[in-house]
Every structure is written in C-alpha cells, then in structure tokens.
Amino acid sequence: MNVLDAGIEGVRSITQPCQLVILVPVAAAVVAGRASWRVVVAAVSGIAVGGWLFITRAIVVGDAAIRWSSLIVICAFGVLLWRRARTPGDLRAAPAVEAVLAAAVGLVTTTWWRPCVGEQLGELLTRGPNEPWATLPASVAFMVGMSTPILAIGLIRAAWQPTPRVAMTLGFVAAGAGLLLGLSVVSGQHGEVVATLFEWSQP
C-alpha cells in the first residue's frame, strides 16, 4: 500500500463535508488551546491514532457509546473555556494541558466519523481489521493528510502572533463552540448531523 498516495487522498478528502465531524471540533480545540505547535501536533496525533483504531476496528463504538464519549469532549472544552476565562497573565505557561485536551478531542471525535471512502481509504478499511500493523503507515498518512486544515491553523497562528487579548477572545469563542458541539452529541443529534454530512459528500 502506497503511503504517499494515502496521504494525498487524505489531503483531497478535506473538501468532503463528512470529514467535518472530526475537523470542526478539533479545530475549535486547537484555537481554544492558543494554536501553539505543541497543541497542533498533539491534536493531529490524536486524529492519527484515533483514525488508525477506527480503520482497524480496534474500537467499535455504537450510538450509546458515542453519546458517552462526548462527555470527554464536553469536559475538555469546559476546561479550555475555564482557562480562556483567566487573565492573559495566567496564560503564559507552556500549554501542556491544552495539548493533552486537544489530543483527547482528536482521538474521541474519530469514533464519531462516518468516512467518505475513496480508493486508498477503502483499501485501508478492508485490510485494516486483519492487517492492523501493515496498514499503520498508510492510515497515519491519510489521517495526517486529512488534518491539513489543523496544520494550517498552526501556521496562521505562528505568522499572525495575535495580542494576548485577541488570542484569549478567539480561544474563549472556540471553546464555547466546541462545548456546544459536545452537548449536541449528548442530546442525540450526532446521527442526524453525520448522515446529513455524508449525503452532502456524495457526488
């Protein structure tokens, strides 16, 4: 299996709405975590690991478990919201907590995924359950490619360097949005949203 082809297909897949179920909450977590490179790398790592577990069917999550898993996302965004509400002076410490929370959001939201299957991902999903380690490199390549918007947020943050007040405001808004997304999953809206995104992704 060609790792490069899998990565390219992952990049191309970001135009498909069905990927938003992962990208939107993770982007919110990254912005809420001040989009440092530590937070960005942690978030993408969470997506990569979660995606591999999804592809290999190492973890199969039903609707009830998805609603329970959303509590992790709600707690993560709750902590991020609380930290963003603190004064700028309290935000100067290295964002280790934000990195852990972003990784958790990336890992959990992959269990909410209903992927739009292309050639490479289709092969991964077919071979993954029986050949988990053989499909690991290509699976990671696909998920990292799909995470290109998250990496772009890190680049924009590095180039822009917003003031502490602006960064805190953006983080506060992003954390609040992520909290609402988590609550929508708990309330049972996830299935309808994912089905709609999947339909939008069909040619």
Residue ranges and their predicted role:
Residues 16-24, 76-88, 145-158:
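Membrane-water interface of transmembrane alpha-helices
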Residues 1-16, 93-112, 130-143, 147-148:
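Small-residue-enriched transmembrane helix starts and helix-helix packing motifs
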Residues 13, 51-55, 77-84, 109, ...:
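Structural signal for membrane-spanning alpha-helices in multi-pass inner-membrane proteins
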Residues 17-25, 112-124:
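Transmembrane helix boundary and interhelical junction motifs in multipass membrane proteins
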Residues 1, 62-114, 159-173, 187-203:
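Alpha-helical multi-pass membrane helix bundles of inner-membrane/thylakoid proteins
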Residues 54-56, 108-119, 178-191:
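Hydrophobic alpha-helical transmembrane segments in multi-pass integral membrane proteins
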Residues 6, 25-61, 121-160:
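A small-residue-rich subset of transmembrane alpha-helices
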